[in-house]
């Protein structure tokens, strides 16, 4: 693989995807410290919202320590060069949430849908584009459909006004060949002015390899997270990825030592538990399950005595997608009852 001379825009997820790993309990002080550290390291884009995007505060998705608006208003005035993005999932976030984020100074809106449901993004993408901001279409769980279907959905988002389309490996399921195929087709068939991005998870230990494959295939933007802080086994660990890019001659504009220090001195001490490929996170990737389901399954294991791994495998078998978190407890309860009935029958 020869990537020498290529450049890429990196996008940090530690303060949005990382909210999943922190049960959305990141303080304003922590948020500002990490964001300003990333800013000083040269990170061009930082995402800040509830883990499930603008308006995610709910019983279903979790109550954060502070509102999206409080986080955004605390961080954005402190940044000198980095721009802030906000994730929005139609059905969770509304146009009013979008307008609030822009009023706070957000520069990029990323509208996320399941990979087969791009049509629900039309209103939000159209509004963001009308308001003149960098507008990204974000196709989640993209491993579940063919490259041709991803392209079909991407073209819908492009037609609504998105100037960048992401192929998103929400489950950390993809291997490099699949990433190359899907990113390569998007790059070949979308408007040349439309950027292509890739968002990976490390559940199979492939996030860095997949991100490199995406760059080789034509991706201009790559998501990651300092120290990997994110759902499941985390996102592409950015300090490691920057080092790999530096060795391969890929220009990121990031100060390697400074981002290493942000990871080690600020993010790792914040972690509630190590972000690693443990058996449950590995099961997410192997079974193709939405990464933010991990902590829900582990909580259900403690409550009902059913293995989180068994819950995750069954969720994968049923083809569950992001937004179906409420099914996890129902499934665990059903599995516990079935096990109890088996004991009685025996």
From Swiss-Prot:
Keyword Metal-binding part of the UniProt annotation: yes
Which is one GO molecular function term here? 4-hydroxy-2-oxovalerate aldolase activity
Q: Which UniProt keywords apply?
A: Aromatic hydrocarbons catabolism, Lyase, Manganese, Metal-binding, Plasmid
| SUPFAM superfamilies, per database record | Aldolase, post-HMGL domain-like
Q: Biological process (GO) annotations? A: catabolic process; L-leucine biosynthetic process
Look up the coiled coil feature and give its residue ranges: none
Q: Which PANTHER family does the annotation name? A: 2-ISOPROPYLMALATE SYNTHASE 1, CHLOROPLASTIC-RELATED, HOMOCITRATE SYNTHASE-RELATED
- Source species taxonomy: Bacteria, Pseudomonadati, Pseudomonadota, Gammaproteobacteria, Pseudomonadales
- Pathway(s) the chain acts in: Aromatic compound metabolism; naphthalene degradation
- Quote the EC number: 4.1.3.39
Give site residues, Transition state stabilizer.
Answer: 16
Taken from the UniProt record, the cysteine pairs bridged by disulfide bonds within this chain are none
Q: Which residues bind substrate?
A: 16-17, 170, 199, 290
UniProt xrefs under InterPro entries: 2-IPM_HCS-like, 4OH_2_O-val_aldolase, Aldolase_TIM, DmpG_comm, DRE_TIM_HOA, PYR_CT
Pyruvate carboxyltransferase domain mapped to chain residues: 8-260
Q: What is this protein called?
A: 4-hydroxy-2-oxovalerate aldolase
The record lists Mn(2+) as bound by 17, 199, 201
Please name the gene that encodes this protein: nahM
Reactions it catalyzes: (S)-4-hydroxy-2-oxopentanoate = acetaldehyde + pyruvate
